[in-house]
């Protein structure tokens, strides 16, 4: 077999249908576009989103208010109840939580949230604390340190 012997697979090369070239060609007269109407005329159809004069969807739905925060801080969050499993007087940081397997996906600096109860005293170092989280950690005898 040589390069000049290579032929395309049977049925892989389909000829383009020539429409509107007489009734015996199979797609004569209206060329498969139907009888009348805007979609059968030249210059084909309507723009995307046009609903025939009905108020289109993009104008029926109200505009969104506000604007996105440009420099939004994305935190890795953890609740106080997850910290309750750690032994007492442990220093809790993002790295230590990752090493212990409590946190797996790290999206950014650590933020401690106040859901759940805490019964052990811990030294927690994080970028941010919620008010509830701070009060629960300090009530258990621990300390909160905000990292810059």
UniProtKB/Swiss-Prot annotation:
GO molecular function per UniProt: rRNA binding; structural constituent of ribosome
Region ranges (Disordered): 1-57
What's one GO-annotated cellular component? cytosolic large ribosomal subunit
What is the protein's known function?
Answer: Binds to the 23S rRNA.
Against PANTHER family, the record matches this protein to: 50S RIBOSOMAL PROTEIN L15 (PTHR12934), LARGE RIBOSOMAL SUBUNIT PROTEIN UL15M (PTHR12934:SF11)
Q: What is this protein called?
A: Large ribosomal subunit protein uL15
Which superkingdom, per the lineage? Answer: Bacteria
Q: Where in the sequence does UniProt note compositional bias of the Gly residues kind?
A: 23-35
Q: Which UniProt keywords apply?
A: Ribonucleoprotein, Ribosomal protein, RNA-binding, rRNA-binding
Q: SUPFAM superfamilies from the xrefs?
A: Ribosomal proteins L15p and L18e (SSF52080)
Tell me which HAMAP family the record gives.
Ribosomal_uL15 (MF_01341)
Composition bias, kind Basic residues: at what positions? 10-20
- GO BP annotations, alphabetical order: translation
Question: What family is this protein classified in?
Answer: Belongs to the universal ribosomal protein uL15 family.
Q: Which NCBIfam families match?
A: rplO_bact
Report the InterPro entries cross-referenced here: Ribosomal_uL15, Ribosomal_uL15/eL18, Ribosomal_uL15/eL18_sf, Ribosomal_uL15_bac-type, Ribosomal_uL15_CS
């Amino acid at each position: 077999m040589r390069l000049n012997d290579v032929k395309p697979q049977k049925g892989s090369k389909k000829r383009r249908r020539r429409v509107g070239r007489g009734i015996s060609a199979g797609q004569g007269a209206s060329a498969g576009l139907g009888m009348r109407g805007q979609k059968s005329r030249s210059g084909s159809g309507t723009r995307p989103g046009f609903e025939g004069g009905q108020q289109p969807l993009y104008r029926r739905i109200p505009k969104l208010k506000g604007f996105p925060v440009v420099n939004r801080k994305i935190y890795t969050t953890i609740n106080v109840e997850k910290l309750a499993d750690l032994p007492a007087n442990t220093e809790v940081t993002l790295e230590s939580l990752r090493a212990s397997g409590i946190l797996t996906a790290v999206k950014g600096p650590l933020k401690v949230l106040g859901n759940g109860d805490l019964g052990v005293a811990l030294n927690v170092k994080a970028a941010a604390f919620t008010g509830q989280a701070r009060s629960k950690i300090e009530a258990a005898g621990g300390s909160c340190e905000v990292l810059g």
